[in-house]
């Protein structure tokens, strides 16, 4: 099983080819390709490469599937005995990213199977 740990949208995510992930909003149009070069770790079978801080020459190629909003989070603040109450909601802007391949020095170590955007195939 091959996977990589990438830094994208202010978070670190473990990604595998053929899967999609919900990440913080990216400024890219749907169906555009997206390349991440901030790769922290790459695992290919028994070989593990750890970057300091990033793995040199490693990239993760993906495709932007859609933009959406996350679940609503309710923030309720109240001060007892003062009749002070605040109720606010927040919905995070998210981007759905489909990972197509993981490459090191231009050589793909893991690629997704032929993928349909509506029904992603999980390799492995």
Swiss-Prot record:
Oligomeric form and interacting partners: Part of the 50S ribosomal subunit. Contacts protein L20.
GO BP: any one term: translation
GO cellular component terms, semicolon-separated: cytoplasm; ribonucleoprotein complex; ribosome
Keyword entries, A-Z: Ribonucleoprotein, Ribosomal protein, RNA-binding, rRNA-binding
Cited function: This protein binds to 23S rRNA in the presence of protein L20.
Family per similarity comment: Belongs to the bacterial ribosomal protein bL21 family.
The protein, known as: Large ribosomal subunit protein bL21
GO molecular function: rRNA binding; structural constituent of ribosome
Lineage: Bacteria, Bacillati, Cyanobacteriota, Cyanophyceae, Synechococcales
Entries under InterPro entries matching the protein: bL21-like (IPR028909), bL21-like_sf (IPR036164), Ribosomal_bL21 (IPR001787), Ribosomal_bL21_CS (IPR018258)
């Amino acid at each position: 099983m091959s996977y990589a740990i990438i830094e994208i949208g202010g978070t670190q995510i473990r990604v595998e080819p053929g899967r999609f992930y919900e990440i913080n909003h990216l400024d890219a149009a749907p169906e555009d390709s997206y390349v991440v070069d901030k790769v922290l770790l790459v695992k290919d079978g028994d070989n593990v490469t750890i970057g300091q801080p990033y793995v040199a020459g490693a990239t993760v190629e993906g495709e932007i599937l859609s933009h959406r909003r996350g679940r609503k989070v309710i923030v309720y603040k109240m001060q007892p005995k003062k009749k002070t109450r605040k109720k606010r909601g927040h919905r995070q802007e998210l981007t759905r990213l489909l990972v197509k391949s993981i490459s090191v020095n231009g050589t793909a170590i893991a690629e997704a199977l032929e993928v349909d955007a509506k029904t992603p195939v999980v390799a492995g």
